[in-house]
Structures are given as C-alpha cells and as structure tokens.
C-alpha cells in the first residue's frame, strides 16, 4: 500500500495533471497569424518578426523606448468631471471607465511625460488605444494642454504619439469641445517657436485626425497605419464603390503629400532625435564613441618639455 501511495499515485498525477502556464506567454500576429513569444515580441518593440506588422504599444513602453535609458517623469494632468452627462448605453460610463482602468492599469487614455531623448530635453504625450479605443475626452484635452504648457514653460519641443478611434461618445459635445481646445494648445507652441512633432500610429481616426494629430510641424507615421477621419468601410458604404488598395494607409498618404515620413518603429527614436535637434537649431547628435578631448595647453607644454634634453636643445631627428 505504501509503494502504491508513495510512488504510483504521485507518478500518475504528474502525468495527467496540467501545468499552469501563463496565458500571455504567446501573442498572435493579427496580420500574418504567426505565434510570437512574448519576450521576443517585447524585444522587437511589438513588431512582428515574420511580417513586420506594427502592433499596439502602450504609452509606458513607448516612453521606455524613447527616453534615454528609459528614464522619464510623468506629468500630472488635471482630472475632469466624472460622467458629466450621466451617460449610459449597455453599461454606465463609470463602469466602462473602471473596466478600462483594470484592464490597462492606467488612469486614462493618454500619458504625458518629460525627460531627455538623445540628451535633448523634451516633453512627450502618447495615447493608449487599449483604453476605450484611445478616445478623445476631457482628460485627453487636459493632457494635451498640460503637455503644451509644460513644453512652453521649459522651452522644450513636444512630441505626440496618436492612437485613437476618435471622440469619446460617452462625453458627447464635451468630447467634441476638445478639438478647439487642443488646437489652441498647439497654437501656444507655435507662438513660442517650439517644435511640435506628431507620430501617427495605427489607428488614428475621427476627431483626433481632424484636430491635434494633423497640426504638427512634422508628421511621421508608422508603417501601414490607418490614418483617416471616416474609415474605409464607412466611405465604401456611402459612395457604393470599392476603394483603392491601401487607401488611407500611411504609405498612401505619404505618396499624396499628407505625411513627411513613414518610419519603422525600430528607427523612430533616431529619426526623432535628428529632426528635433534640427528644429531646435542644435548640432547633430553624436553617434558611437565620442572623440578623445583635445589636450590642454599645460599638457602640451609638459609633452614638449619631455621631448627636450636637459640643456634645452631640441630633440635630435636621428
């Protein structure tokens, strides 16, 4: 009996029992269907290693990749009124907010931070599409205003990463009001002669595209990002025609003069450093090892003295 209980039963249990495996070890590429190991995907900045599809990236992950050594300071954003319209569809608006905060571990759909990028001080803002579709509400409006005011106060450029489905339905006209508010915030930067660079990521649509996302001094997009006001499906149903291949995608907009660059995520930081320093009138960033410093005058005199004999005669050329 002891042999059965001590050896056979544990052996059977070990064979038939399922190991508990974390659910987030693997991710499936939505473009090509390849299963990607989470660490491999994270090291590649959430870009598929098979088809180069750019997946969503959280604001904190973007800032970690953007700022020097991943170090940044989050800027506090004023909190707006909670559920001012008492909106309810299938769920109450506060319940949707609570679910989004639980799922993302973030307070709202935009994060604002400051730090250094290539030794250049900047202010950055990024939208989180996983938080209610990155929708533009009163908080997002407050965040952009806070970012612009901080940039003006410190005389720093502002870099914004957009990712949104448009205005937040649950806030109604108060959400649409953020379009002129954010436009005024961008104008503050222009009056202060500070660069405003927008990186459009997939997707950037609706009222976000119609306001602050297309008001930058430079517009850069990630590959194959959908950038539009009304989506292609809505347009096709309205005009009853099939749209061209790649319509409203980043490459299409670049060909038609709506964008300045389409840049791979892996090269985005270097691109932003170059453009930011150029617009700020700074010298190009030094890449690689810095050159050895020039010798000081006292060092040069010491070196000359070591090459001279005790009688003061110059060294022999033999």
UniProtKB/Swiss-Prot annotation:
Residues 286-318 are annotated as: Disordered. A zinc finger (C4-type) spans 29-51. Binds 1 zinc ion per subunit. Its main location: cytoplasm. InterPro entries: AcCoA_carboxyl_beta, Acetyl_CoA_COase_Trfase_b_su, ClpP/crotonase-like_dom_sf, COA_CT_N, Znf-ACC. Pfam families: Carboxyl_trans, Zn_ribbon_ACC. Pathway: Lipid metabolism; malonyl-CoA biosynthesis; malonyl-CoA from acetyl-CoA: step 1/1. It catalyses: N(6)-carboxybiotinyl-L-lysyl-[protein] + acetyl-CoA = N(6)-biotinyl-L-lysyl-[protein] + malonyl-CoA. One of its GO terms (biological process) is malonyl-CoA biosynthetic process. The keyword Hydrolase does not apply. PROSITE patterns: COA_CT_NTER. Its EC number is 2.1.3.15. Keywords: ATP-binding, Cytoplasm, Fatty acid biosynthesis, Fatty acid metabolism, Lipid biosynthesis, Lipid metabolism, Metal-binding, Nucleotide-binding, Transferase, Zinc, Zinc-finger. It comes from the Bacteria. Its cofactor is Zn(2+). It is found in: Cytoplasm. One of its GO terms (cellular component) is acetate CoA-transferase complex. Residues 25-294 form the CoA carboxyltransferase N-terminal domain. Zn(2+) binds at residues 29, 32, 48, 51. GO terms for molecular function: acetyl-CoA carboxylase activity; ATP binding; carboxyl- or carbamoyltransferase activity; zinc ion binding. Component of the acetyl coenzyme A carboxylase (ACC) complex. Biotin carboxylase (BC) catalyzes the carboxylation of biotin on its carrier protein (BCCP) and then the CO(2) group is transferred by the transcarboxylase to acetyl-CoA to form malonyl-CoA. Acetyl-CoA carboxylase is a heterohexamer composed of biotin carboxyl carrier protein (AccB), biotin carboxylase (AccC) and two subunits each of ACCase subunit alpha (AccA) and ACCase subunit beta (AccD). Belongs to the AccD/PCCB family. This is Acetyl-coenzyme A carboxylase carboxyl transferase subunit beta. It comes from Jannaschia sp. (strain CCS1).
